[in-house]
Amino acid sequence: NLKNIYWQLKGIGIFNLAPVLGLYVLIPLANLAAYGMGHDMDYLYVNIVKQCQIFCPILSVWYVIFVLEHCIEEPGNELLYIRHRNKLPELLLCYLAFQILLLPLFAVYTGMFPDLWWLYLKLCVIQLLYLGLAYFTAFLCRKITISVLAVLCYSISTVMAATIEVQGISYYKVIVNQGADLVRELIPFALAAGVMLIGGCICNYYFPMRK
Protein backbone atom coordinates (compact mmCIF):
# COMPACT_ATOMS: atom_id res chain seq x y z
CA ASN A 1 0.00 0.00 0.00
CA LEU A 2 2.75 2.46 0.89
CA LYS A 3 4.55 1.72 -2.36
CA ASN A 4 1.35 2.27 -4.35
CA ILE A 5 0.72 5.61 -2.64
CA TYR A 6 4.31 6.70 -3.26
CA TRP A 7 4.10 6.11 -7.00
CA GLN A 8 0.62 7.59 -7.26
CA LEU A 9 1.62 10.81 -5.50
CA LYS A 10 5.01 11.07 -7.16
CA GLY A 11 3.24 11.82 -10.42
CA ILE A 12 1.69 15.07 -9.14
CA GLY A 13 5.09 16.63 -8.47
CA ILE A 14 5.05 20.05 -6.85
CA PHE A 15 1.34 19.76 -6.04
CA ASN A 16 2.37 17.48 -3.16
CA LEU A 17 3.35 20.65 -1.31
CA ALA A 18 -0.17 22.12 -1.32
CA PRO A 19 -1.25 20.75 2.11
CA VAL A 20 2.06 21.78 3.68
CA LEU A 21 1.83 25.30 2.27
CA GLY A 22 -1.81 25.54 3.31
CA LEU A 23 -1.12 24.48 6.89
CA TYR A 24 2.17 26.25 7.50
CA VAL A 25 1.90 29.34 5.29
CA LEU A 26 -1.73 30.19 4.47
CA ILE A 27 -3.32 29.57 7.88
CA PRO A 28 -0.49 31.15 9.96
CA LEU A 29 -0.47 34.23 7.70
CA ALA A 30 -4.22 34.60 8.24
CA ASN A 31 -3.65 34.26 12.00
CA LEU A 32 -0.87 36.85 11.99
CA ALA A 33 -3.01 39.26 9.99
CA ALA A 34 -5.84 38.85 12.51
CA TYR A 35 -3.50 39.42 15.45
CA GLY A 36 -1.90 42.43 13.75
CA MET A 37 -5.25 44.19 13.46
CA GLY A 38 -5.54 44.78 17.20
CA HIS A 39 -3.02 42.63 19.07
CA ASP A 40 -5.97 40.94 20.73
CA MET A 41 -5.36 37.34 21.85
CA ASP A 42 -9.08 36.60 22.01
CA TYR A 43 -9.48 37.68 18.39
CA LEU A 44 -6.47 35.54 17.45
CA TYR A 45 -8.05 32.54 19.18
CA VAL A 46 -11.30 32.97 17.24
CA ASN A 47 -9.39 33.38 13.98
CA ILE A 48 -7.42 30.18 14.58
CA VAL A 49 -10.62 28.24 15.25
CA LYS A 50 -12.31 29.64 12.14
CA GLN A 51 -9.39 29.22 9.74
CA CYS A 52 -8.67 25.66 10.86
CA GLN A 53 -12.28 24.60 10.40
CA ILE A 54 -12.38 26.14 6.92
CA PHE A 55 -9.09 24.96 5.45
CA CYS A 56 -7.98 21.82 7.31
CA PRO A 57 -10.85 19.54 6.18
CA ILE A 58 -10.37 20.51 2.52
CA LEU A 59 -6.60 20.10 2.69
CA SER A 60 -7.05 16.72 4.39
CA VAL A 61 -8.50 15.15 1.21
CA TRP A 62 -5.90 16.62 -1.15
CA TYR A 63 -3.82 13.42 -1.35
CA VAL A 64 -6.96 11.29 -1.16
CA ILE A 65 -8.35 12.90 -4.31
CA PHE A 66 -5.19 12.22 -6.31
CA VAL A 67 -5.04 8.59 -5.16
CA LEU A 68 -8.71 8.16 -6.11
CA GLU A 69 -8.08 9.76 -9.50
CA HIS A 70 -5.32 7.24 -10.14
CA CYS A 71 -7.56 4.33 -9.10
CA ILE A 72 -10.63 5.41 -11.06
CA GLU A 73 -9.69 7.44 -14.14
CA GLU A 74 -6.13 6.44 -15.06
CA PRO A 75 -5.81 4.20 -18.17
CA GLY A 76 -5.13 0.60 -17.20
CA ASN A 77 -6.41 1.10 -13.65
CA GLU A 78 -8.00 -2.35 -13.72
CA LEU A 79 -4.55 -3.73 -12.89
CA LEU A 80 -4.75 -2.01 -9.50
CA TYR A 81 -7.66 -4.26 -8.48
CA ILE A 82 -6.07 -7.64 -9.19
CA ARG A 83 -4.48 -8.11 -5.75
CA HIS A 84 -6.18 -5.51 -3.56
CA ARG A 85 -9.69 -4.56 -4.60
CA ASN A 86 -10.50 -2.39 -1.56
CA LYS A 87 -8.71 0.96 -1.75
CA LEU A 88 -9.84 2.20 1.66
CA PRO A 89 -6.61 1.12 3.45
CA GLU A 90 -4.56 3.30 1.09
CA LEU A 91 -6.90 6.24 1.65
CA LEU A 92 -6.73 5.77 5.43
CA LEU A 93 -2.94 5.98 5.21
CA CYS A 94 -3.33 9.34 3.46
CA TYR A 95 -5.74 10.40 6.20
CA LEU A 96 -3.32 9.39 8.96
CA ALA A 97 -0.42 11.11 7.20
CA PHE A 98 -2.38 14.36 7.22
CA GLN A 99 -3.20 14.05 10.93
CA ILE A 100 0.52 13.67 11.64
CA LEU A 101 1.28 16.64 9.39
CA LEU A 102 -1.22 18.65 11.41
CA LEU A 103 0.37 17.87 14.79
CA PRO A 104 3.23 20.44 14.77
CA LEU A 105 0.79 23.24 13.93
CA PHE A 106 -1.44 22.33 16.85
CA ALA A 107 1.55 21.91 19.13
CA VAL A 108 2.17 25.62 18.56
CA TYR A 109 -1.51 26.52 18.92
CA THR A 110 -1.92 24.61 22.17
CA GLY A 111 1.19 26.27 23.52
CA MET A 112 -0.80 29.51 23.29
CA PHE A 113 -4.30 28.12 23.95
CA PRO A 114 -4.25 24.69 25.68
CA ASP A 115 -7.89 23.90 24.95
CA LEU A 116 -7.23 23.84 21.19
CA TRP A 117 -6.29 20.17 21.49
CA TRP A 118 -10.04 19.62 21.52
CA LEU A 119 -10.22 21.36 18.15
CA TYR A 120 -7.58 18.96 16.83
CA LEU A 121 -9.68 15.98 17.98
CA LYS A 122 -12.75 17.52 16.39
CA LEU A 123 -10.93 18.00 13.10
CA CYS A 124 -9.83 14.36 13.12
CA VAL A 125 -13.49 13.30 13.06
CA ILE A 126 -14.57 15.94 10.54
CA GLN A 127 -11.70 15.02 8.24
CA LEU A 128 -12.78 11.38 8.41
CA LEU A 129 -16.18 12.56 7.21
CA TYR A 130 -14.51 14.34 4.29
CA LEU A 131 -12.60 11.16 3.48
CA GLY A 132 -15.85 9.19 3.47
CA LEU A 133 -17.56 11.76 1.27
CA ALA A 134 -14.72 11.76 -1.28
CA TYR A 135 -14.44 7.95 -1.27
CA PHE A 136 -18.16 7.28 -1.61
CA THR A 137 -18.91 9.85 -4.32
CA ALA A 138 -15.80 8.95 -6.35
CA PHE A 139 -16.64 5.25 -6.62
CA LEU A 140 -20.39 5.82 -6.87
CA CYS A 141 -20.15 8.29 -9.76
CA ARG A 142 -16.85 7.03 -11.19
CA LYS A 143 -15.80 10.65 -11.69
CA ILE A 144 -13.25 12.53 -9.59
CA THR A 145 -14.73 15.86 -10.69
CA ILE A 146 -18.01 15.00 -8.98
CA SER A 147 -16.15 13.94 -5.84
CA VAL A 148 -14.25 17.25 -5.74
CA LEU A 149 -17.47 19.20 -6.26
CA ALA A 150 -19.18 17.25 -3.46
CA VAL A 151 -16.37 18.08 -1.04
CA LEU A 152 -16.31 21.76 -2.02
CA CYS A 153 -20.11 22.10 -1.89
CA TYR A 154 -20.27 20.52 1.56
CA SER A 155 -17.46 22.73 2.83
CA ILE A 156 -19.16 25.89 1.56
CA SER A 157 -22.62 24.83 2.75
CA THR A 158 -21.42 24.06 6.28
CA VAL A 159 -20.02 27.59 6.67
CA MET A 160 -23.22 29.07 5.23
CA ALA A 161 -25.36 26.87 7.50
CA ALA A 162 -23.42 28.13 10.51
CA THR A 163 -24.37 31.71 9.69
CA ILE A 164 -28.06 30.84 9.96
CA GLU A 165 -27.46 28.42 12.88
CA VAL A 166 -28.69 25.23 11.23
CA GLN A 167 -28.12 22.54 13.86
CA GLY A 168 -26.80 19.11 12.90
CA ILE A 169 -25.44 20.22 9.52
CA SER A 170 -22.59 22.56 10.30
CA TYR A 171 -19.47 21.75 12.30
CA TYR A 172 -18.24 25.33 11.83
CA LYS A 173 -18.40 26.88 15.31
CA VAL A 174 -16.47 29.59 17.12
CA ILE A 175 -16.84 27.87 20.49
CA VAL A 176 -14.70 24.75 20.92
CA ASN A 177 -16.61 22.18 22.95
CA GLN A 178 -14.73 19.91 25.33
CA GLY A 179 -15.22 16.46 26.83
CA ALA A 180 -18.75 15.07 26.74
CA ASP A 181 -20.07 18.15 24.94
CA LEU A 182 -17.63 17.56 22.09
CA VAL A 183 -18.59 13.88 21.91
CA ARG A 184 -22.27 14.80 21.61
CA GLU A 185 -21.46 17.37 18.94
CA LEU A 186 -19.45 14.90 16.86
CA ILE A 187 -21.72 11.83 17.06
CA PRO A 188 -23.80 12.78 13.96
CA PHE A 189 -20.67 13.51 11.93
CA ALA A 190 -18.99 10.27 13.04
CA LEU A 191 -22.09 8.28 12.09
CA ALA A 192 -22.27 10.02 8.71
CA ALA A 193 -18.59 9.25 8.15
CA GLY A 194 -19.19 5.59 8.96
CA VAL A 195 -22.14 5.34 6.57
CA MET A 196 -20.17 6.95 3.75
CA LEU A 197 -17.13 4.76 4.31
CA ILE A 198 -19.31 1.65 4.22
CA GLY A 199 -21.06 2.95 1.10
CA GLY A 200 -17.70 3.69 -0.44
CA CYS A 201 -16.48 0.15 0.29
CA ILE A 202 -19.56 -1.30 -1.42
CA CYS A 203 -19.16 0.90 -4.52
CA ASN A 204 -15.42 0.18 -4.52
CA TYR A 205 -16.09 -3.58 -4.44
CA TYR A 206 -18.33 -3.47 -7.50
CA PHE A 207 -16.23 -0.93 -9.41
CA PRO A 208 -14.05 -3.47 -11.31
CA MET A 209 -17.17 -5.45 -12.30
CA ARG A 210 -18.75 -2.37 -13.90
CA LYS A 211 -15.80 -1.58 -16.17
Feature locations, PLM:
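Aromatic- and glycine-rich beta-strand/loop motifs that create alpha-glucan
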Residues: 1-23, 137
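Alpha-helical transmembrane segments
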Residues: 15-29, 57, 59-62, 95-104, 131, 155, 192-197, ...
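Hydrophobic alpha-helical transmembrane segments
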Residues: 17-22, 92, 120-121, 148-149, ...
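Secretory targeting signals
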Residues: 32-69, 90-152
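Terminal transmembrane helical anchor/hairpin motif
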Residues: 35-43, 141-211
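Short helix-to-coil transition segments within interhelical loops
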Residues: 79-87
